[in-house]
Amino acid sequence: MSAAPAPSRLIVKVGGAVARESAGRILGLAEEGHQVIVVHGAGPQITREMERRGIPVEFVQGRRRTSRAAVEVVRESMEQVNAELCAALGERAVPVLGHRDGLLAVPVPPLGQVGDPLPCRPRKILQALSAGRVPMVAPLAVGPLNVNADDASAALALGLGAKRLVFLTDVPGLFVDDELVDAIDAGRATRMLDEGRFEGGIVPKLRAAALAAASGITATIGNTLVVA
């Protein structure tokens, strides 16, 4: 008798704007037998709280400039969204707080308390997967350093050997010249990014998807497939 195929391992990135609404789809993937690692953002929550406290909000190529005061807002907001998502998924979810559980990053001093994530294999994630549970990753790195959740998703996909990287967003996919595209290759995506053809939150998503695709990982942004 042949052995049953190993379950596929996939990273699901959910934005703070759609995090709670994504619980059903995440559970569905897990129930299909996939090993699902969720990386969530908290962008809207962070921005609201920074504005409430009078902390300047500034983005550089889709990444948040983060002062020492701002990184505390990031931590609090990430922990809040993480707890809400874990509650929505129920007992299957395992909270993984990156700054405590080994998410590694290289500091980017010009942006303040910000880091570029490194491919890594946090022990708590591996333990959760072995137990058939769903790690819920808040992407604040050891430091603490604010790490863009899209970049963290790609780094974890590489470090954990994921087969797929799925971006669940509040937009249907990637638009090129105002047209929704079904697919784009990583090389073209990278060239267009270098040319400044995109702006805002799609920049880190496409950059992360292109990095993953170039490494052989199937990446999707909404309904758009990013291929090698």
Question: What label would you give each PLM region?
Answer:
Residues 2-228:
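C-terminal catalytic "cap/lid" subdomain
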